[in-house]
Design a protein with these regions (language model features):
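Bacterial Sec-dependent N-terminal signal peptides
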Residues: 1-30
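Beta-propeller-forming repeat regions
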Residues: 21-29, 37-390
Length: 390
């Protein structure tokens, strides 16, 4: 009974604060300037024409809640349990301080409806044609023949294919016999796997695959001839772990991309067992290790793909701390899903190759700006798009 009382109290307090908060001082802005200003508070501002009118309208209630305006009949906390509501309120993902007046909110919606297209009709396939991969031949392999199998990981390491399913199974596949064998079993799905040079194995267990504010993820290490050991628990939907000796002290640091949902982070578990927060926002998909500024210290580069979509570098300082810097930022509709950092043009500088195409959100439609991009480094850490394939 106490749990239910607390649940309804939290809902009441949230709705009270978001609807009865202090109103912002009104500033007279043109509709275009108002859109550009308010839609750039949390991320790169999109343009109105990136979505059709009906999808903007569908997104208004959520957008309003983010700005502190609660539209009639909309509860952004619907479907969450008590712990999730606690986490969202504490994070202030939905601001308690209204950042637009009711009049400005109406002005924003009218501007979007007047200027958004009825449909996005400029979707065209790229004209660039690629040569056939004549050096390769496809070979079908049998991984998901069992009813209800959902593959959550494919990892090819040391001539062995490892894969995992939604139900916590972790398997190896033998190419010669075309047979799979169960390697380990976990409570929930494994979504990332890494073998270290010393033979240790790192397993990233997501917890709950569907969007949630519950922190159910875990990080495991399997050392040779030892029982599997839990490194960390209560992780927020972790999807990737980079396990490397970043400061060259002989010990491994684990950099964890906690994608999360409304909240999330990039965290790092150091060799002494402490956990450091590198990035306080959701959407981290993966982290790589590079010497970005060529100072001899290994830095981190991460892809963040939720809200404030960006590629962020974490420059290692001499004291071992990491300083975040944006390398690239994208509007929140770009659907960033992967990146690689390579010297693509052979000039000695690391360039960026990004894939944009995640479309599983409230604004599902074919989007002409989804595709593969190559952004070249000018040598000073500035990146400019040089190639786009749709």
């Amino acid at each position: 009974m106490k749990t239910y009382s607390r649940f309804f109290l939290l809902i009441f307090l949230f709705l009270f604060f978001i609807s009865c908060n202090q109103k912002p001082n009104p500033v007279v802005l043109s509709s275009k300037d108002l859109f550009a200003q308010k839609c750039a508070l949390c991320h790169v501002a999109p343009t109105v024409d990136v979505l059709p009118k009906h999808l903007w309208t569908k997104f208004f209630p959520e957008l309003g809640a983010k700005m502190g305006v609660l539209e009639s009949g909309y509860n952004p906390l619907k479907g969450m349990n008590v712990n999730e509501i606690d986490a969202v309120i504490e994070s202030e993902y939905y601001t308690r301080n209204q950042i637009v007046t009711n009049e400005q909110w109406t002005q924003l919606k009218e501007y979007i409806i007047q200027n958004a297209p009825d449909k996005i009709d400029n979707y065209q396939r790229s004209e660039h044609q690629f040569n056939n991969l004549d050096a390769f031949k496809p070979k079908k392999i049998n991984l998901d023949n069992n009813p209800g199998t959902f593959i959550t990981l494919l990892s090819f390491q040391n001539d062995v294919l490892y894969y995992a399913d939604l139900f916590g199974g972790f398997y190896t596949y033998d190419f010669k016999s075309n047979q799979s064998s169960e390697y380990k079993r976990f409570e929930n799905a494994i979504v990332w796997y890494q073998q270290l040079k010393n033979g240790d194995e790192i397993f990233t267990e997501i917890g709950k695959l569907d969007p949630t504010e519950q922190r159910l993820g875990k990080l495991w290490i399997q050392k040779e001839n030892q029982e599997i050991e839990l490194i960390a628990s209560e992780l927020h939907r972790p999807v990737h772990t980079l396990s490397q000796d970043l400061n060259k002290d002989g010990s491994i640091e684990h950099t964890i991309s906690e994608f999360g949902h409304l909240t999330g982070s990039i965290s790092q578990i150091t060799s002494n067992g402490t956990s450091d927060l590198l990035w306080p926002n959701p959407g981290a998909i993966q982290t790589q290790m590079h010497d970005v500024n060529k100072d001899g210290l290994m830095d981190l580069v991460s892809l963040v793909a939720q809200g404030d979509e960006a590629i962020v570098s974490f420059i290692q300082q001499k004291n071992g701390d990491f300083k975040p810097e944006y390398l690239m930022r994208y509007p929140p509709n770009y659907g960033s899903s992967w990146f690689e950092m390579k010297d693509f043009d052979g000039d000695g500088d690391l360039d960026l190759i990004t894939a944009n195409g995640d479309n599983a959100d409230l604004t599902y439609t074919q989007k002409p700006y989804h595709g593969m991009r190559i952004s070249l480094n000018d040598g000073d850490g500035n990146f400019e798009e040089a190639f786009f394939y749709q």
